[in-house]
From Swiss-Prot:
GO molecular function terms attached to this record: translation elongation factor activity
UniProt cross-references to Gene3D superfamilies, sorted A to Z: 2.30.30.30, Nucleic acid-binding proteins
Protein name: Elongation factor P-like protein
Phylogenetic classification of the source organism: Bacteria, Pseudomonadati, Pseudomonadota, Gammaproteobacteria, Lysobacterales
Biological process (GO), any one: peptide biosynthetic process
Length: 188
């Protein structure tokens, strides 16, 4: 698979190890003939050791076959998150450092999560495209400010903060895009 086809969450072989891509930076320098370069932040699977590597768009990486098991978030065990397989109720336990920033989107009973499994070991999760979270703290709407679309900060029930439109109030349930971390509309 070419470097320019790789997406966040893919698992690849590199330097005799297996790594999951967590972040991708694309740069197109003006010199050097304008070759597009990709910088991947990867974590070893299993182990979670961070690796930073750069590739040209045409560089080939071998994608690793992994199982994707649809699961539901069950509970937190210390720093670990426990997910139950939707079909056979197999528990998958992943440490908080493996979950990373995705922890801010995980609520009790969240469904539609895919646990990625290699050699019967859970290595990562893939969240649904959007999740419903509750606004617990946001400033009130400014009266007379309806002509402008000013976003305002809102703290959500999982502890993350996003920008929301002015008409959103405390206690309201909102959709949040898990890929961008942005407000995606009202829930319900």
């Amino acid at each position: 698979m070419k470097a320019n086809d790789i997406k966040k969450g893919n698992v690849v072989e590199y330097n005799n190890g297996v790594y999951q891509i967590r972040d991708i930076e694309r740069s197109s320098p003006q010199g050097r003939g304008g070759n597009v370069r990709f910088r991947f932040i990867m974590y070893s699977v299993p182990g979670g050791n961070k690796l930073d590597a750069s590739f040209d768009a045409d560089d080939n990486l071998v994608e690793v076959e992994l199982l994707r098991r649809q699961s539901t978030y069950s509970y937190k065990d210390g720093d670990a998150f426990v997910f139950l397989d939707d079909e056979d109720y197999t528990p998958y336990t992943l440490d908080a450092d493996v979950i990373g920033d995705d922890a801010g989107y995980i609520t009790d009973g969240l469904t539609g999560i895919y646990v990625q499994v290699i050699d019967e070991q859970p290595v990562a999760i893939q969240l649904p495209a959007s999740v419903v979270l509750e606004v617990i703290e946001t400033p009130p709407e400014l009266k007379g400010g309806t002509a402008t679309k000013r976003p305002k900060p809102a703290k959500l029930n999982t502890g993350i903060e996003i920008m929301v439109p002015e008409y959103i109030v405390n206690g309201e349930r909102v959709l949040v895009n898990t890929a961008t971390g942005e407000f995606a509309g009202r829930a319900d």
